[in-house]
Curated annotation (Swiss-Prot):
The gene is glgB. Monomer. GO terms for biological process: glycogen biosynthetic process. GO terms for molecular function: 1,4-alpha-glucan branching enzyme activity; cation binding; hydrolase activity, hydrolyzing O-glycosyl compounds. This is 1,4-alpha-glucan branching enzyme GlgB. Keywords: Carbohydrate metabolism, Glycogen biosynthesis, Glycogen metabolism, Glycosyltransferase, Transferase. Pathway: Glycan biosynthesis; glycogen biosynthesis. Catalyzes the formation of the alpha-1,6-glucosidic linkages in glycogen by scission of a 1,4-alpha-linked oligosaccharide from growing alpha-1,4-glucan chains and the subsequent attachment of the oligosaccharide to the alpha-1,6 position. It comes from Bordetella pertussis (strain Tohama I / ATCC BAA-589 / NCTC 13251).
Length: 731
């Protein structure tokens, strides 16, 4: 809107002209656009490289603006009255043609002051709707509004395809005290590439991608993209209404973890579109309930697998457009599958176009490297003590859950957030205000995050990757916990894989590695993870961890999966594990699908499908996952034979799992059972349908009134080597 500038009489002093043309003027609205000069209205336009500029009134009257210096134009415009922001348009002659546009400096502030205040106070959860690039219509003029939080910057301009990436042309307005820079650019629409040119507090000018960009270029390009804001046509209303019940602790949850870039190679086609056509049906056919994706957020380095993201609001462009990702989620829901995303609020890379020193100061990160530099990954650590940073991160989480209908977030590297001395030697970390190692600000952030998700995204879940014994990770915030819904059981995973790697002849000496997990199984609500981390960096594949020849390896992997699926806790399996990938995972190559030409690998895949089916349909295997009454040891101390037997129960059903972790058959093996009567074999991992040799027990066994293991009834059977059996009581 035009404003009175009594000190300006139709010309600018030399210092102001120089600052404008040098790209150093911090308050462009004070000099550009329409201004009152006595009884007249003066219009000034900064258009370096333009040949001529005219102001055109609605009636067609044209007034040429005269160059004060090359690129800086000014004139009195007869007939132009105050108070009408879009009362004229500009006709600019460039070397390559004529441009007709409204003057961005003829418009008043475009961001709502109350929303800015709310945002500054940390209460704005939909930050992606306020900052970044948004289609807008101002006073009947269509365009894009840009906004960036950079409170310490001396000047900010938006640059892009629309202005030849010339940082002089579109300097932004500072909305004080929020520290937000804004500008409405007429005629800029979806697909336009842009960045922010920031003159920082340190005096350096840098180009930064938009932290709130909802679309970005594919690496190695680094620009942000004005998104297409047409709403996606979701078809998942029924799923969204049911998902809370599908994700409760008494529901069966079996997660298929996927790296979108290497699950299948579709010869250059848009990856989300092709994944949507293949992956949901595949995961559904194997009985999984959820797909968990390694981070899909925009990230500059593919070798990070997405765990060093810079675009916390934008899907990675390498896999397709944002609408393609929404389509993928919609197809998953159509197939009855939830979608969980890995999400990384623990750290970010220091790429020059990213968040690092965004306004010439350590804005998102800590200034002191003892707090702000991660020693393991050489990345920067978010300053959780800063209200605006917490708001930014929580807004990212809410954005994925609401805008993309995602059903849960697996929060990466929580342990590194909780401890100030994580991976740091003495003297290289700063204690908290109590002189201790706990990161109090990170604790508060995680609690605030989980509380916000619970309020803003009903039915969505959060899962912590937390590898220590921090108490109360899944306890409610009101009870002093962190408020997560689930926690990865890293201890169970490490103990049991260590056991399975051992030569079977030595396993008797390490029996506790299998049983110890039940000591703390109900301390949290757990997910049992066989994740991507266990099949990289020289660790080999899951199949390769099993000792012996190939047939023995497959038999042991079948046994291990059956043990896992019967054990309390939700399940997670990384892609390729379902059919026994032989090689270590390579993010640059697709899975070894050709292995499914081998009946033994097809058998393993069939077992995973059957385990998921049994797990989902037998309530005793899932409904008391968080209740100690749902589990009872029967044989927990037979280390000499490396045999375990335990019961999973609910109010009406009982299933007993018996596992032999050596190749030695145990003929006439007797174990107690809680009930008299018939017990039917529901799973036999040695069956020929799974690639085993067969020869297991009959399909139905009847208990005998012979006491064993504290029970008045018992079963006796010939227990094959490297075999797990599920026996269910027949009511």
């Amino acid at each position: 809107m035009m404003r009175d500038s009594p000190s300006i009489q139709g010309t600018l002093d030399a210092a102001t002209q120089h600052a404008l043309l040098a790209g150093r003027h911090a308050d462009p609205f004070s000099v550009l656009g329409p201004h009152q000069a006595g009884a007249h209205t003066v219009v000034r336009v900064l258009a370096p490289g333009a040949r001529t500029v005219m102001a055109v009134l609605p009636g067609g009257q044209r007034t040429p603006l005269l160059p004060m210096q090359p690129g800086l134009f000014e004139n009195t415009v007869p007939g132009l009255q105050p108070g009408a922001p879009a009362a004229y348009r500009l006709c600019i002659e460039w070397e390559g043609g004529i441009q007709h546009t409204a003057d961005p400096y003829a418009f008043g502030p475009v961001l709502d002051a109350a929303q800015l205040d709310h945002c500054a106070a940390g209460g704005w959860r939909y930050l992606a709707g306020l900052l970044g690039a948004h289609a807008a219509s101002v006073d009947g003029c269509a365009g894009t509004r840009f906004a960036l939080w950079a409170p310490n910057a001396r000047r900010v301009a938006v640059v892009g395809d629309f202005n030849g990436w010339d940082g002089r042309r579109h300097a932004m307005r500072l909305r004080y005290p929020a520290g937000v820079w804004e500008l409405f650019l007429p005629d800029v629409g979806p697909g336009a590439r842009y960045k922010f040119q920031v003159l920082g507090a340190d005096g350096h000018t840098v180009l930064k991608a938009d932290p709130l960009a909802r679309q970005a270029e594919a690496p190695p390009a680094t620009a942000s993209i004005v998104p297409d804001e047409r709403p996606f046509a979701w078809t998942d209303k029924a799923w969204m209404e049911q998902r809370a019940a599908r994700q409760r602790c008494d529901a069966p949850i079996s997660i298929y973890e996927v790296h979108a870039g290497s699950w299948f190679d579709d010869a250059g086609a848009p990856r989300w579109q092709n994944l949507a056509a293949r992956l949901p049906e595949y995961a559904r056919s194997l009985g999984f309930t959820h797909i968990e994706l390694l981070p899909v957020m925009a990230h500059p380095f593919g070798g990070s697998w997405g765990y060093q993201p810079l675009g916390l609001f934008a899907p990675a462009a390498a896999h397709g457009a944002p609408a393609d990702f929404a389509h993928f989620v919609d197809r998953c829901h159509e197939a009855g599958l939830g979608v969980i995303l890995d999400w990384v609020p623990a750290h970010f890379p220091d790429d020059a176009h990213g968040l690092a020193r965004l306004d010439g100061t350590p804005l998102y990160e800590h200034a002191d490297p003892r707090e702000g530099r991660h020693p393991d990954w050489n990345t920067l650590i978010y300053n959780y003590g800063r209200r605006e940073v917490r708001t930014f991160l929580i807004a990212s989480a809410i954005h994925w859950l609401r805008h993309y209908h995602v059903d849960g977030l697996r929060v990466d590297a929580v342990a590194s957030m909780l401890y100030r001395d994580y991976s740091r030697p003495a003297g290289q970390w700063i204690p908290n205000r109590h002189g201790r190692r706990e990161n109090l600000e990170a604790i508060d952030f995680l609690r605030e995050l989980n509380a916000a998700v619970g309020v803003q995204c009903p039915g969505a879940i959060t899962v912590a990757e937390e590898s220590t014994a921090w108490p109360g990770v899944t306890a409610p915030v009101a009870n002093g916990g962190l408020g997560f819904d689930y926690k990865w059981n890293m201890g169970w995973m490490h103990d049991t894989l260590r056991y399975m790697r051992r030569d079977p002849i030595h396993r008797r000496h390490h029996h506790h590695d299998l049983s110890f997990g039940m000591v703390y199984a109900y301390a949290e609500r757990f997910v049992l993870p066989l994740s991507h981390d266990e099949v990289v960096h020289g660790k080999g594949s899951l199949l390769g961890k099993m000792p012996g020849e190939r047939a023995a390896q497959l038999a042991q992997l079948r046994l291990y999966y059956a043990f896992m699926w019967a054990h309390p806790g939700k399940k997670l399996l990384f892609m390729g594990g379902e059919f026994g990938q032989q090689g270590e995972w390579n993010h640059d190559a697709m899975l070894q699908w050709s292995l499914l030409d081998d009946p033994a690998h097809r058998g393993l895949q069939r077992l995973v499908a059957d385990l998921n089916h049994v797990y989902a349909t037998l309530p005793e295997l899932h409904c008391r996952d968080a209740d100690p009454s749902g589990f009872a040891w029967i044989v927990g101390d037979d280390a000499d034979n490396s045999v375990l037997a335990f019961a999973r129960v609910d109010a009406s059903h009982c299933l007993v799992a018996v596992c032999n972790f050596t190749p030695v058959p145990r003929p006439g093996y007797r174990f107690g059972v809680p009930h008299a009567g018939d017990w039917r074999v529901r799973v036999d991992t040695g069956a020929t349908r799974y690639g085993g040799a067969g020869g297991g027990p009959p399909i139905c066994l009847r208990s005998e009134p012979i006491p064993a293991h504290g029970h008045p009834q018992s079963l006796v059977l010939d227990l094959p080597g490297f075999t797990a059996l599920y026996l269910r009581h027949s009511e």
